[in-house]
Curated annotation (Swiss-Prot):
Cleaves peptides in various proteins in a process that requires ATP hydrolysis. Has a chymotrypsin-like activity. Plays a major role in the degradation of misfolded proteins. It is found in: Cytoplasm. NCBIfam families: PRK00277.1 (NF001368), PRK12553.1 (NF009205). PROSITE patterns: CLP_PROTEASE_HIS (PS00382), CLP_PROTEASE_SER (PS00381). Belongs to the peptidase S14 family. This is Probable ATP-dependent Clp protease proteolytic subunit 3. Its EC number is 3.4.21.92. GO terms for cellular component: cytoplasm; endopeptidase Clp complex. It comes from Synechocystis sp. (strain ATCC 27184 / PCC 6803 / Kazusa). One of its GO terms (molecular function) is ATPase binding. The keyword Cytoplasm applies. CDD domains: S14_ClpP_2. Pfam families: CLP_protease.
Length: 202
């Protein structure tokens, strides 16, 4: 049986009464966003909305983006990435579990010096995927060229974020490339491996 979204009690300031809200809404009130699924248009729209709201609420306070995601849509992920760069509030990224593909890209896109991972987290980078299906040859050619363009764009951003060369990023992402939290730090995907919440604030 699938587990539904858990609800938690919440008391409005100045009120003696509690009401139940879903845990993700409650976390957002603490400026915490949790990406815990495949990146698609629906989840991207939700995260973008949270980012925009929290930035407008107080751009001087950081936003915490926790990531445990296998990746997903490049266009949906880029919508989140662009919003992270657009807003004034810094976005601290924390990997719990797995940050793969677009999940790893978003992890590396956090505020400089504040891209974090828990000790047993795993990070995986690879090139963007594409499918041909049953389509005309000209359409397949168009998609292939677009995938190559996107791959180059992602490689350039990852090189800028990690300090690696574009050539090394291209070579390493040619196939699935897994890293431990410590290896991801050495690679430049994250800045620190943390064991408790206080370490992330230093």
């Amino acid at each position: 049986m699938p587990i539904g979204v858990p609800s938690v009690p919440f008391r409005l300031p100045g009120s003696q009464y509690e009401r139940w809200i879903d845990i993700y809404t409650r976390l957002s009130q603490e400026r915490i966003i949790f990406l815990g699924q495949e990146v698609n248009d629906s989840i991207a729209n939700r995260i973008v909305a949270f980012l925009l709201y929290l930035d407008s609420d107080d751009p001087s306070k950081p936003i915490y983006l926790y990531i445990n995601s296998p990746g997903g849509s490049v266009t949906a992920g880029m919508a989140i990435y662009d919003t992270m760069q657009y807003i004034k509030a810094e976005v601290i990224t924390i990997c719990v579990g797995l940050a793969a593909s677009m999940g790893a890209f978003l992890l590396a896109s956090g505020a400089p010096g504040k891209r974090l991972a828990l000790p047993h987290a795993r990070i995986m980078i690879h090139q963007p995927m594409g499918g041909t299906g049953r389509r005309q040859a000209t359409d397949i050619d168009i998609e292939a060229r677009e995938i190559l363009r996107i791959r180059q764009q992602l490689n350039e951003i990852m090189a800028q974020r990690t300090g690696q060369t574009v050539e090394k990023i291209a070579k390493d992402t040619d196939r699935d490339y897994f890293l431990s939290a410590a290896e991801a730090k050495e690679y430049g995907l994250i800045d620190k491996v943390i064991e408790n919440s206080t370490m992330g604030n230093n």
